[in-house]
């Protein structure tokens, strides 16, 4: 079980030789290997990795020395140096890291992944549960609203800023990006401005791109039983209050589903619960435990009791 990149890690482990036979059922919360940032094709990661090695004074050749040196560098430093490896004229909010698993040669000692999860020749068959927050992409939008300069630039020149925020250069050829951005703007915004007045459209865009499309593709390409649920309940607290300037209205946003499983006193030390909060938490915990025990997701039903198919 994992959330966000942890959910993507769960999904990628389906294809990891070292994890074969270790699972009975799997749970991914807002994260699959098909999401951007969750898997890094080697063609995209070789040059940035060597640049990172130079920044931490590791040799880039031979590869054995490169790997041995990099393994001894504190992971915090590797993440902190990312902005120097992927520089942009526009500094985007730090909502995650671009470093992700990539394909390793089968000859490597204990390789994690030897095939691309997106094009794997076999289909795993573990019972798999996916849960998405209705406004998962709100996490990105909240950070944008918390950076006045970035918010202004996005409103003034979305064709310049959106490709950077979405890191389209990691997924598409540079020549195709202008047309892709035009289609994005036409589909989500039409003739409307891009900014606070179109918060819901921004949230839909970032939700679709970073979360929903990946889950849809992963589910359609899955070989076993897979269930996908959209979490819509808003607890009395939300991670929106901790992101950006705290003004984002869309919810439940990224990670909010965790608030129905865990109290999280670190982030919400004064949290209180309504009767409905408790009711939903009990439902979610019981349904999750049931799925973990027997792989049956049927206890995840809407609170109104409607049948889910």
Language model segments and positions:
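Serine-hydrolase-like catalytic core of hydrolytic proteins
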Residues: 1-67, 72, 89, 103-106, ...
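Short, solvent-exposed turn/loop segments enriched in Gly/Ser/Thr/Pro and often Arg
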Residues: 4-5, 229-237, 303-309
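Surface-exposed helix-capping loop/turn segments at secondary-structure junctions
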Residues: 59-63, 222-227, 290-308
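Substrate-gating cap/lid region and adjacent catalytic-acid/histidine neighborhood
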Residues: 34, 69, 76-278, 287, ...
């Amino acid at each position: 079980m994992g959330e966000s990149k942890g959910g993507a890690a769960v999904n990628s482990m389906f294809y990891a030789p070292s994890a074969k036979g270790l699972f009975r059922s799997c749970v991914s919360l807002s994260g699959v290997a098909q999401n951007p940032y969750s898997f890094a094709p080697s063609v995209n990661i070789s040059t940035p990795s060597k640049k990172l090695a130079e920044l931490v004074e590791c040799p880039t050749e031979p590869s054995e020395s490169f790997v041995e040196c990099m393994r001894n560098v504190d992971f915090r430093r590797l993440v902190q140096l990312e902005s120097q490896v992927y520089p942009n004229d526009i500094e985007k909010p730090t909502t995650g890291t671009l470093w992700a698993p990539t394909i390793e040669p089968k000859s490597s000692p204990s390789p994690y992944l030897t095939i691309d999860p997106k094009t794997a020749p076999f289909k795993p068959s573990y019972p798999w549960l996916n849960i998405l927050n209705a406004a998962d992409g709100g996490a990105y939008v909240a950070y944008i609203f918390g950076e006045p300069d970035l918010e202004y630039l996005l409103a003034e020149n979305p064709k310049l800023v959106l490709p950077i925020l979405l890191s389209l250069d990691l997924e598409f050829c540079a020549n195709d990006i202008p047309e892709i951005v035009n289609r994005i703007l036409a589909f989500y915004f039409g003739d409307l401005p891009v900014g606070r007045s179109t918060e819901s459209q921004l949230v839909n865009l970032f939700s679709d791109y970073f979360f929903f499309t990946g889950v849809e593709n992963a589910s359609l390409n899955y070989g076993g039983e897979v269930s996908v649920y959209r979490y819509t309940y808003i607890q009395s607290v939300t991670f929106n209050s901790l992101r950006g300037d705290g003004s984002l209205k869309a919810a439940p946003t990224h990670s909010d589903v965790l608030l129905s499983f865990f109290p999280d006193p670190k982030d919400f030390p004064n949290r209180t619960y309504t009767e409905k909060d408790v009711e939903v938490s009990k439902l979610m915990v019981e349904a999750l435990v049931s799925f973990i025990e027997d792989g049956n997701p049927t206890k995840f039903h809407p609170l109104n009791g409607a049948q889910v198919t």
